[in-house]
Amino acid sequence: MSEHIVTPEDASAAPAIKSEKINLLDLNRQAMREFFKTLGEKPFRADQVMKWMYHYCCDDFDEMTDINKVLRGKLKEVAEIRAPEVVEEQRSSDGTIKWAIAVGDQRVETVYIPEDDRATLCVSSQVGCALECKFCSTAQQGFNRNLRVSEIIGQVWRAAKIIGAAKVTGQRPITNVVMMGMGEPLLNLTNVVPAMEIMLDDFGFGLSKRRVTLSTSGVVPALDKLGDMIDVALAISLHAPNDEIRDEIVPINKKYNIETFLAAVRRYIGKSNANQGRVTIEYVMLDHVNDGTEHAHQLAELLKDTPCKINLIPWNPFPGAPYGRSSNSRIDRFSKVLMSYGFTTIVRKTRGDDIDAACGQLAGDVIDRTKRTMRKRMQGEPIAVKAV
């Protein structure tokens, strides 16, 4: 059965979905077992249903043939499996696919990036973003709300269903998930962590913890909490070799400076097995802003005590941005300086930029309700880790 993609016209015409049924996509395995316990069922029934949901992308209880008819009927009365719908699809000349996914009356964006040996899905965690990184299109849209567990894992579910339906086209199944889409994942831990647990669960998508990566700009208290909650690979959105530059392009640095951030990163490395002893440093290359050889020397000195590999990211432009992309020659010189210090340094290949699906280009459709409030809190009061 081919996967239906809802048109924007369909989405705008459809009434808002209001249901008192439990959306099983909101439940990790522990919560799923608790739910089945309330139905008077044994825990293995939860495992059976999860296997149908995630191994087969099944959202119809009647298709779950190893579940007895009485239980299927009971589930239809009190529960549902409802993933967010794709309302627009764009395909890049390089094979990258970007989906606009409806979450309520707004959209987030999810990107599928196939390569020879893997297929990576870039997943959003919030509707918009409050951190206001100056080089990122998402940040310019403002912030509306956190995504629910079902809206996060639902992006993976929906993509897996589409790619599965497209097997005849030779598309690779999803092998890696990166929490690098719209939003700051650490500002939505309550929903991001259960979603990642489902990604890792053998009855969920069964991914290795080394193949699920969370990227953060540096919400230090939440990073410390993350290390006590789950073990996944970590990517650090650093982007500057000193506080002066980072204060300007990554404003959260005014609250949690580089020294404080990297200390938290080292604490996480000490707790984590997924990172194999080192994290990934993400560094966007902005022409004559942070890409000089002097900046490379500063960065190498800064990171000497942090086990890491470094990804240099050619900046991807968006309308109204005040920056330019570093030239290949400047990126090459920068990379060679870092390698001379012994750092593994990779220049990230730009994918999907012809459909605005590249790093920093995701925008979605955001009603900005809380951006100014979050800005004030970043400048003064501590940022709380909030749920939906």
UniProtKB/Swiss-Prot annotation:
Catalysed reaction equations from the record: adenosine(2503) in 23S rRNA + 2 reduced [2Fe-2S]-[ferredoxin] + 2 S-adenosyl-L-methionine = 2-methyladenosine(2503) in 23S rRNA + 5'-deoxyadenosine + L-methionine + 2 oxidized [2Fe-2S]-[ferredoxin] + S-adenosyl-L-homocysteine; adenosine(37) in tRNA + 2 reduced [2Fe-2S]-[ferredoxin] + 2 S-adenosyl-L-methionine = 2-methyladenosine(37) in tRNA + 5'-deoxyadenosine + L-methionine + 2 oxidized [2Fe-2S]-[ferredoxin] + S-adenosyl-L-homocysteine
**What GO MF annotations does this protein's record show?**
4 iron, 4 sulfur cluster binding; metal ion binding; rRNA (adenine(2503)-C2-)-methyltransferase activity; rRNA binding; tRNA (adenine(37)-C2)-methyltransferase activity; tRNA binding
Record's GO cellular component terms: cytoplasm
Keywords, A to Z? 4Fe-4S, Cytoplasm, Disulfide bond, Iron, Iron-sulfur, Metal-binding, Methyltransferase, rRNA processing, S-adenosyl-L-methionine, Transferase, tRNA processing
Q: Which of this chain's residues are annotated to bind [4Fe-4S] cluster?
A: C129, C133, C136
Q: Where in the chain are disulfide-linked cysteines found?
A: C122-C359
Catalytic residues?
Answer: E109 (proton acceptor), C359 (s-methylcysteine intermediate)
**Annotated cofactor note:** Binds 1 [4Fe-4S] cluster. The cluster is coordinated with 3 cysteines and an exchangeable S-adenosyl-L-methionine.
Q: Which HAMAP family match?
A: RNA_methyltr_RlmN
The UniProt record's further free-text remark is: Reaction proceeds by a ping-pong mechanism involving intermediate methylation of a conserved cysteine residue.
What's the stated role of this polypeptide? Specifically methylates position 2 of adenine 2503 in 23S rRNA and position 2 of adenine 37 in tRNAs. m2A2503 modification seems to play a crucial role in the proofreading step occurring at the peptidyl transferase center and thus would serve to optimize ribosomal fidelity.
Output this protein's name. Answer: Dual-specificity RNA methyltransferase RlmN
Recorded source organism is: Cronobacter sakazakii (strain ATCC BAA-894) (Enterobacter sakazakii)
Task: State which gene encodes it.
Answer: rlmN
